[in-house]
Amino acid sequence: MFAPPLIRRPAAGIVLIVEDHLLVQITATARIEDAGLSTLVAGDADEAMAILTSRDDVAAVFTDIDMPGSMDGLALAAIIRRRWPQIQVVVTSGQRPSKAAGLPDGVAFFQKPYDYSNLVNQFR
């Protein structure tokens, strides 16, 4: 698992989970909320962008790389880093870390399957 240093830890605020698979959405939401954090869910990057432009309380984004829609998770991560540099970004994929070679600076990567306790610690 490759996880570069994070630039921000959301002690408060919402973790936006961007995932197109319902079971992964439900599980990630439950685990992150069980850790005492608030969540929102988006099914793709386009929905995530709509949420990010309409809210100012999102502190972190946890996104899959491979998703349907107009952009993948890497493109979403790059946009977030440019437009909202204060938002922590964590990306995930079932592919090997080379898939995440295009990670923007300050973005962490978790390869699926990941340990939820390690993931939750990224947001504390």
Language-model regions, residue ranges each:
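Two-component/phosphorelay signaling modules centered on CheY-like receiver
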Residues: 22-40
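Acidic, metal-coordinating helix/loop segments flanking the phosphotransfer/catalytic sites
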Residues: 41-60, 100
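Non-catalytic signal-transmission and effector/linker regions of two-component phosphorelay proteins
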Residues: 1-16, 22-23, 82, 86, ...
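Active-site residues of response regulator receiver
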Residues: 64-65
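Conserved phosphotransfer cores of two-component systems
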Residues: 53-56, 79-86
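Hydrophobic/aromatic residues positioned on beta-strands within the core alpha/beta folds
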Residues: 92-93
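Acidic catalytic/metal-coordinating carboxylates
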Residues: 44, 71-76
